[in-house]
């Protein structure tokens, strides 16, 4: 009998750590922020945005910025993306748009000014938080794992800075 030449349970080993639960994540991130005054929490598909905003708003009262508030109006985004849509629900066209194309340049400029003038730490939350954040910001990618652990969320530190190197 022929033996299968594929791995039924593929995995990738990562360095660093995975942290579960927003209270623990926020506590750990506050320790790791050091002198950094900006924390960008970029959200992966499937993360409950309101849950994340609520958790961070409790700890960083009045200092949480929602990327959704920096987006262009819905009508403008529809106009921007309509050329990629078709009548077929399964097929469309691959877009050449970037995340920055969905953001309102004036709102982003105002947000960046507010960030640069801030005295206390600011948390930017949402898809594209790392795009809005300054280069020296601590960037965290948050993702949800509902299949295995209910509605628990995980954070993985990566990108421009990681507390694990």
Where are the predicted features?
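ATP-dependent small-molecule kinase phosphotransfer cores
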Residues: 2-24, 62-121, 158, 162
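Glycine-rich P-loop/Walker A and Walker A-like loops and their local beta1-loop-alpha1 context
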Residues: 15-29, 36-57
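A short, charged/proline- and glycine-enriched loop
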Residues: 34-37, 120
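Short, solvent-exposed loop/turn segments at secondary-structure junctions
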Residues: 46-47, 129-130, 154
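Short glycine-/acidic-enriched loop or helix-start segments at secondary-structure transitions
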Residues: 50-52, 132-135, 158-159
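ATP-dependent NMP and nucleoside kinases share a basic, alpha-helical "lid"
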Residues: 59-60, 109-151
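Positively charged, low-complexity/disordered segments
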Residues: 150-165
């Amino acid at each position: 009998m022929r033996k299968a030449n594929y791995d039924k349970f593929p995995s990738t080993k990562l360095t660093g750590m995975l942290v579960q639960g927003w209270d623990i994540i926020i506590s750990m991130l506050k320790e790791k922020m050091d002198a950094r005054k900006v924390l960008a929490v970029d959200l992966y598909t499937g993360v409950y945005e309101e849950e994340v905003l609520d958790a961070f708003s409790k700890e960083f009262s009045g200092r949480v910025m929602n990327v959704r508030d920096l987006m262009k109006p819905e009508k403008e985004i529809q106009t921007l993306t309509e050329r990629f849509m078709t009548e077929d629900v399964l097929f469309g066209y691959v877009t050449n748009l970037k995340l920055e194309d969905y953001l309102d340049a004036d709102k982003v400029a105002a947000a960046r000014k507010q960030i640069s003038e801030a005295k206390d730490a600011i948390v930017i939350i949402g898809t594209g938080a790392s795009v809005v954040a300054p280069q020296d910001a601590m960037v965290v990618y948050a993702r949800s794992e509902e299949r295995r652990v209910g509605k628990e969320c995980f954070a993985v530190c990566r990108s421009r800075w990681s507390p694990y190197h």
